[in-house]
Amino acid sequence: MADGISSFWGPVTSTIECCEMNYAYSSYIAEFYNTISNVPGILLALIGLVNALRQRFEKRFSILHISNMILAIGSMLYHATLQHVQQQSDETPMVWEILLYMYILYSPDWHYRSTMPTFLFLYGAAFAIVHAYLRFGIGFKVHYVILCLLCIPRMYKYYIHTEDTAAKRIAKWYVATILVGSICWFCDRVFCKTISQWPVNPQGHALWHVFMSFNSYCANTFLMFCRAQQRGWNPKVKYFLGVLPYVKIEKPKTQ
């Protein structure tokens, strides 16, 4: 929320502000809670990346975890500054990331191997160029939701073809986190005037970041399990510190 407090970054130039008082804790951080709430996303992506590298999963999963980290860092920059350029560093990686998910989901059954990655790369590059010059506003949200919806049929197909109970539980956590996170985001956007009058702001957008951090981790872990099944790597779900699920594989000696 805009206010009259002076800041290091100057006037707000982003097209979106969340329901949090600007520069309440520091003249260097516009939205404090919305900034620090991206830390779980970075840590979870780092854990996933280490697991993918240690067990030599396909490079696509390492890139996916790295894209999660880039998105979280871009979001931190955006909410810390509320500048239009930093807003693009948040929104453009969101689209790139979902395009990467589309590749991982659909590529196993795609007969023309070079066609899909080429198209998705050109699409992502074109979007980045256009987005650098145009402020889409609601158009960006609609575009992003459409891309997300295109992933649902394949995610559901993987779910119904997975018999492992632990893997299915991860998929259910994926659905639960995105639903709860979306409710937090919606309330923060729609009921901000009412929330601002409460004694304590629940920081709905910050909660959205936290839930989506776990959502991305669950999605990545579930997809790693499904891909390992396709490759015959005998995947099993294990738990880091007894809480955080990850995929343990046993590759045949020939691989």
Swiss-Prot record:
Tissue-level expression: Mostly expressed in roots, shoot meristems and pollen, and, to a lower extent, in mature leaves.
Subcellular location: Endoplasmic reticulum membrane; Golgi apparatus membrane
Membrane topology: Multi-pass membrane protein
Sample GO molecular function, one term: hydrolase activity, acting on carbon-nitrogen (but not peptide) bonds, in linear amides
Loss of function: phenotype: Pleiotropic phenotypes, including reduction of leaf size, dwarfing, small flowers and an irregular wax layer. The abnormal wax layer is associated with higher water loss and rapid chlorophyll leaching due to an increased cuticle permeability. Increased phytoceramides levels and decreased long chain bases. Increased sensitivity to salt stress. Increased susceptibility to the pathogenic bacteria P.syringae with reduced pathogenesis-related (PR) genes induction. Reduced sensitivity to abscisic acid (ABA) leading to impaired stomatal closure regulation.
Main location per the UniProt record: endoplasmic reticulum
Cofactor: Zn(2+)
TM ranges: 29-49, 61-81, 92-112, 119-139, 140-160, 170-192, 206-226
Keyword set includes Metal-binding: yes
GO cellular component, one term: endoplasmic reticulum
EC number: 3.5.1.-
Known role: Hydrolyzes only phytoceramide into phytosphingosine and free fatty acid. Does not have reverse activity. Affects plant morphogenesis. Required for the formation of wax layer that ensure cuticle permeability. Implicated in abscisic acid (ABA)-mediated stomatal closure. Involved in both biotic and abiotic stresses. Promotes salt resistance and defenses responses toward pathogenic bacteria (e.g. P.syringae) and against the fungal toxin fumonisin B1 (FB1).
Family that this chain belongs to: Belongs to the alkaline ceramidase family.
Name under which the protein is recorded: Alkaline ceramidase
Organism: Arabidopsis thaliana (Mouse-ear cress)
Gene giving rise to this polypeptide: ACER
